[in-house]
Amino acid sequence: MNVLIIGSGGREHALAWKVAQDPRVAKVFVAPGNAGTATEAKCENVAIDVLAIEQLADFAAANVQLTIVGPEAPLVKGVVDLFRSRGLDIFGPTAAAAQLEGSKAFTKDFLARQNIPTADYQNFTEVEPALAYLREKGAPIVIKADGLAAGKGVIVAMTLVEAEEAVRDMLSGNAFGDAGARVVIEEFLDGEEASFIVMVDGENVLPMA
């Protein structure tokens, strides 16, 4: 079978490399891919942007039997929903589920509603209430741009001055564009960070490692 990998980063390179090793796979297309994926055996780059989801669906319908999505942005845009509506097999969460990655405020509110332990927080869209909250809580404290910011939207502020600067940069300085139009101000937690990643289909849970 043929497989399409959506994305252009190292994550997608690793996915393409691994998928290509499966003897059941004849060809791996990577859209848009990168210089590394272009050199892998059985892999071919395709010049389609990750957010051109209609074009990706057209390509998949004509060329592949399975699509795997790497980046968050097309997931949030609804690439999985579109593919499924057209009867195309695709691995990834729906746009609704992808909000857990696409919006930190959504995720924090979800955790709070479900009584899942999480650091204390508040969401803000205006500078002055956010600054007042900072002064109430003090430092160290964590400032997060709500939306996708290419991994750069989190500031661990060790001083109040640094925290206030981060809030102003995000909410009024447009430091992260629309991603920073809302911020999450979160309690600073000291300790080791660990991730446990699983695959789910709504009923079954499969650990990846």
Language-model regions, residue ranges each:
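ATP-binding N-terminal substructure of ATP-dependent carboxylate-amine bond-forming enzymes
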Residues: 1-96
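Short beta-strand-to-turn element immediately C-terminal to the catalytic PLP-Schiff-base lysine
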Residues: 7, 124, 155-159, 199-201, ...
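Structural detector of well-ordered beta-strand residues that form the stable sheet scaffold
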Residues: 29, 68, 91, 119, ...
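Glycine-rich beta-alpha junction loops
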Residues: 34-35, 147-148, 187-192, 200-204
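A conserved helix-loop-beta module that forms one wall/lid of the active-site cleft
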Residues: 93-153
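Conserved ATP-binding module of the ATP-grasp superfamily
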Residues: 117-120, 140-142, 158-195, 199
